[in-house]
């Protein structure tokens, strides 16, 4: 598989920032993304039951060079703002995975335009193996295994993780944040999840 078009779109700068697909993570806003991608970008407030939720923007199909797939932008928004937007939402609709999508008011959508892009995920339409990822991006700094067998390859220099499913039923997901935020936003949650998976596995072995 050729991921050449994807890697060409990633530029890390000296101060720990990152530009992916023309968007500077941590600096550009939802308004910047709308200006770049137009009406095909779909912003939404999404949340699971009992959660405050998150502001996301989806674009599918999204073309990254020669590879197309699904692009999801995530944003830095305070819990207070998210709670207020959710309470004022007129209605919501159910999505897959127990997630609900909330209709934001016109005023809240205007406020959301100023939210800074914290990171993004790109799921290529083609299936990628761990070997494909290594061939394109080189040896990862670290590899972690999650409870569901997903292997996550970590590339802190370009603020990227590649989550490769064990079964091949789902597609490989590439996640990007600014390299300066890599440990806090991506690595720390992954390490915690991998440790929990390892502990659960050890416990299961001990009881068998």
Tell me what each language-model feature is.
Residues 26-27:
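Glycine-centered tight-turn and secondary-structure capping sites
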Residues 1-3:
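Membrane-interface motif at the C-terminal end of an N-terminal transmembrane signal
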Residues 30-208:
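A cross-family detector of function-defining hotspots
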Residues 20-23, 123:
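Short, flexible active-site loop motifs that bind/organize anionic cofactors or intermediates
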């Amino acid at each position: 598989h050729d991921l050449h078009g994807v890697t060409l779109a990633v530029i890390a700068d000296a101060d720990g920032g990152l530009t992916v697909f023309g968007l500077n993570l941590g600096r550009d806003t939802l308004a910047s993304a709308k200006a770049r991608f137009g009406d095909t970008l779909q912003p939404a407030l999404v949340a699971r039951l009992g959660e405050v939720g998150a502001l996301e923007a989806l674009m599918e199909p999204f073309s990254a060079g020669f590879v197309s797939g699904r692009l999801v932008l995530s944003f830095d928004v305070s819990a207070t703002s998210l709670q207020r937007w959710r309470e004022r939402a007129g209605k919501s609709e159910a999505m897959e995975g127990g997630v609900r999508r909330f209709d934001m008011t016109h005023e809240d959508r205007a406020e959301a335009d100023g939210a800074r892009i914290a990171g993004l995920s790109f799921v290529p339409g083609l299936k990628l193996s761990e070997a494909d990822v290594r061939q394109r991006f080189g040896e990862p700094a670290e590899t972690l295994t999650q409870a569901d067998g997903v292997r996550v390859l970590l590339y802190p220099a370009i603020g990227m993780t590649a989550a490769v499913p064990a079964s091949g039923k789902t597609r490989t997901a590439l996640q990007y944040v600014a390299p300066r935020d890599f440990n806090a936003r991506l690595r720390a949650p992954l390490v915690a999840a991998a440790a929990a998976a390892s502990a659960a596995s050890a416990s299961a072995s001990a009881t068998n």
